[in-house]
């Protein structure tokens, strides 16, 4: 192949064909790994025919006793997992208390030990004042607390923590008497860890019982109504404490709402209210007359019986035929009998006439029969409401029918005469035919004689 490729006179593209042939040969040669994998695949996933032919080996039965069979189905209790226990030597080697610390470790465990050298001195130059939680330096050089380290002195960091010194350090607090609402100076301390006041809940279980109750002031009313006790609100003691603290000359009543109302009333010209109470409203007298409202008692309700409308009548205002004839003074039975008698007469007359089906002149009887049938149908289709009028109209109709019958009688007689005349003509024709037969026989005889 190399020689063919290296030859100068080889066809262009011959090397590509040789490469394809070589790849096809390599593909046809199965590799040993492929053979192994194919054998494993055939065993794991046999074909349907192989799976049907191969038979699985049956396991031999195991003989057990009846007692074992009875206890075989019961669930056996699983043994509890045995935990690995320490040996006696390991138990003795375990520590029984905290390890004694050295002096260096004690120094390290103090508050702020790991952050002393971070960012320069803690309270040194002013460059550290820009950090969050650091001390603030004012213009006059006085240091004031800021952040979580408010009012913390440098000497506090060198000492041990209060939590390490005493288990219950809150009990060693000294209660400082003072009002909780007093305003503190801006530069004074009082952070989270350096609060100067002690909670009342820590001192006494029920501190409400020790709260001094302020007596009500005995105030005399100027209006002559007698003396009374003045009621104070819960916030008046706070206002009095503020006045005493700041030295207000107006007294505790200068900041109350009652005093302000009195001052506003005096400015408007109205008399001041007595005892700091709300001023009474002075309304303008009524000028319009009072409308008299008359109370009208409702009358007793009148029961109105309303007939329920019946369902819609599909026939409208139509009434039975019997009722209409009874109002007119006529008997409907007599009218029905008359109609039936006329009907029977018409039927009998129609039955007497012959039913002829011939054409031409013989068709008069059919026409008369049709007229009779139409007249009968017309008589039965009349409305029941106008029965009287119909009965009156039927009288001339019956007379006209009788006249038609009388007029039709000569026509029928003429037709019968024509029929008889026709029958005679037919008989004459038959006679003529019979008379011509001997002449034919004579002619036949003459022919036979001539032949002889």
From Swiss-Prot:
Q: Which residues carry this modification: Phosphoserine?
A: 234, 270, 300
For the modification N-acetylalanine, which residues carry it?
2
User: Mind listing the UniProt keywords for this protein, alphabetically?
Assistant: Acetylation, Initiation factor, Nucleus, Phosphoprotein, Protein biosynthesis
Residue ranges, compositional bias (Low complexity): 126-136, 265-280
User: This protein's superkingdom?
Assistant: Eukaryota
Any one cellular component term from GO for this entry? nucleus
Cite the record's Acidic residues compositional bias ranges.
Answer: 387-397
Name its species: Arabidopsis thaliana
Compositional bias, Basic and acidic residues, is annotated for 98-110, 137-156, 227-243, 369-386, 400-419, 441-452
Q: What is this protein called?
A: Eukaryotic translation initiation factor 4B3
What is the annotated signal peptide range for this record? none
Q: Which cysteines are joined by disulfide bonds?
A: none
Q: Which family does it belong to?
A: Belongs to the eIF-4 subunit B family.
- Functional summary from the UniProt entry: Promotes the eIF4F and eIF4A RNA-dependent ATP-hydrolysis activity with different efficiency depending on mRNAs, thus providing mRNA discrimination during initiation of translation.
Q: Name one Pfam family in it.
A: eIF-4B
- In chain numbering, where does the motif Nuclear localization signal 1 fall? 172-179
Matching entries from InterPro entries are given as:
EIF-4B_pln
The UniProt regions of compositional bias labelled Polar residues, in chain numbering, are 28-37
Q: Which stretches does the entry tag as region Disordered?
A: 20-282, 349-452
Where is the motif Nuclear localization signal 2 annotated in this sequence?
215-222
What are the recorded GO MF terms, alphabetically?
Answer: mRNA binding; protein homodimerization activity; translation initiation factor activity
* PANTHER family per record: EUKARYOTIC TRANSLATION INITIATION FACTOR 4B (PTHR32091), EUKARYOTIC TRANSLATION INITIATION FACTOR 4B3 (PTHR32091:SF17)
* Subunit and partners: Homodimer. Nonspherical monomer. mRNA-discriminating component of initiation complexes. Interacts with MAD2.
Its PTM note reads: Phosphorylated.
Q: What would be the name of the gene that encodes this protein?
A: EIF4B3
Which locations, inside or outside the cell, does it occupy?
Nucleus
Question: Where does the record place Gly residues bias?
Answer: 111-122
